[in-house]
């Protein structure tokens, strides 16, 4: 056996080691459009895989694969925690979203998604938007987060923000014995589509906010909003948000915000927000517990949007979405109580609850093969 052959076998073995927890990984290549993408299906015990598609100029295929594998596994737990009948998946497109997009590229991507026969449903994520997926929808009906004009649920930031507020209410219940949002001080990092709605909801209940955002107009808007409520807003610098004398830190921007540096600065009693992957490592969940800071697992708190897009695949029913989103309150309380009872971190408690649900379903159905059929189909 030649050195080249040995090297190839080692690389193949390493690849299978990396995806050992996953059911399926699809490498998509279309030279005509320049499409290079990876679709990772982690687990379909609960139903077809569901997860967004992001587009980034990854430095290597290996980096893109790592992202797809990590994010798809996270979606499995998020779906299980949200009590929706879907498993975890994720797609990544290798390319610069500012330069490399084209209608043809997303139609090619749609063809690859459709080839999976309903095992994977996807929609927008970092670097992609609904305009991109209107093109993909010409090749597949396995697209979620569809605009209302196409029969979808519309803006998913609304139920996402609502879920965050329910998560905060549950956190306040655990901290103070009552779930009122008003009369509590919050430090909100990020006033994007979700963060701004969360801030509005808290202000309307009479909360006191420290806020930071890179957009000056957004900061001015939330200060104007505060004038119409019994709440108040104080704008702080981005690097000062972690050290505010607040009750609850509400991260609504980016991940990894609970790390060695911020741990030294936190003066809050709890953390509950919409940002994904807030803990830089699992160890930081333990560090928070040791410091007496209550942590609301992000993938439960921010699951309102997922609940809506999962609901789309059957028939949009906003009342049903609202009712399911309200259960985030109960889920977070259950996590807190279980963590306290078992003397484990809240993240460990949340993961354990999800694994128990998957194990129970796995005794009846361990592999999803048939397709859910959404009502829209604009394929040519």
From Swiss-Prot:
Enzyme class name: oxidoreductase
Gene3D superfamilies: Leucine Dehydrogenase, chain A, domain 1, NAD(P)-binding Rossmann-like Domain
Listed pathway(s): Amino-acid biosynthesis; L-phenylalanine biosynthesis; L-phenylalanine from phenylpyruvate (PDH route): step 1/1
Alphabetical list of InterPro entries matching this protein: Aminoacid_DH-like_N_sf (IPR046346), Glu/Leu/Phe/Val/Trp_DH (IPR006095), Glu/Leu/Phe/Val/Trp_DH_C (IPR006096), Glu/Leu/Phe/Val/Trp_DH_dimer (IPR006097), Glu/Leu/Phe/Val_DH_AS (IPR033524), Glu/Phe/Leu/Val/Trp_DH_bac/arc (IPR016211), NAD(P)-bd_dom_sf (IPR036291)
GO MF: nucleotide binding; phenylalanine dehydrogenase activity
Catalytic activity: L-phenylalanine + NAD(+) + H2O = 3-phenylpyruvate + NH4(+) + NADH + H(+)
This protein's name: Phenylalanine dehydrogenase
Organism in which the protein naturally occurs: Bacillus badius
């Amino acid at each position: 056996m030649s050195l080249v052959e040995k090297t190839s076998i080692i690389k193949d073995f390493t690849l299978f080691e990396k995806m050992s927890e996953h059911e399926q990984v699809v490498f998509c290549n279309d030279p005509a459009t320049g499409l290079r993408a990876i679709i990772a299906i982690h687990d379909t015990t609960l139903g077809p895989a569901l997860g967004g598609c992001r587009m980034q100029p990854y430095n290597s295929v290996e980096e893109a694969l790592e992202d797809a594998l990590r994010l798809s596994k996270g979606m499995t737990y998020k779906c299980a925690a949200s009590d929706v009948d879907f498993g975890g998946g994720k797609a990544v497109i290798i390319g610069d979203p500012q330069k490399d997009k084209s209608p043809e590229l997303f139609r090619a991507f749609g063809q690859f998604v459709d080839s999976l026969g309903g095992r994977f449903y996807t929609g927008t994520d970092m670097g992609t938007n609904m305009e991109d997926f209107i093109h993909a929808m010409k090749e597949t009906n396995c697209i979620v987060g569809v605009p209302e004009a196409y029969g979808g649920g519309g803006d998913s930031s609304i139920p996402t923000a609502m879920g965050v507020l329910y998560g905060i209410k549950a956190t306040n219940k655990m901290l103070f014995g009552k779930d009122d949002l008003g009369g509590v001080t919050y430090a909100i990092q990020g006033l994007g589509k979700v963060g701004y709605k969360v801030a509005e909801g808290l202000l309307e209940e009479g909360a006191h906010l420290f806020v930071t955002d890179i957009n000056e107009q957004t900061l001015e808007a939330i200060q104007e909003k505060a004038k119409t409520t019994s709440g108040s807003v104080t704008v702080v610098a981005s690097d000062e948000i972690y050290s505010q004398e607040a009750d609850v830190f509400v991260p609504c921007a980016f991940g990894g915000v609970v790390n060695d540096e911020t741990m030294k600065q936190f003066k809050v009693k709890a953390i509950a927000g919409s940002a994904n992957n807030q803990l830089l490592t699992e160890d930081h969940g333990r560090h928070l517990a040791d410091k007496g800071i209550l942590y609301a697992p992000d993938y439960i708190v921010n699951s309102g949007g997922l609940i809506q897009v999962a609901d789309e695949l059957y028939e949009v029913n906003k009342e049903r979405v609202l009712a399911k989103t309200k259960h985030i309150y109960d889920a977070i309380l259950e996590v807190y109580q279980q963590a306290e009872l078992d003397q484990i971190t809240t993240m460990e408690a949340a993961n354990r609850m999800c694994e128990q649900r998957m194990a129970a379903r796995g005794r009846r159905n361990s592999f999803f093969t048939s397709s859910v059929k959404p009502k829209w189909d604009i394929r040519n």
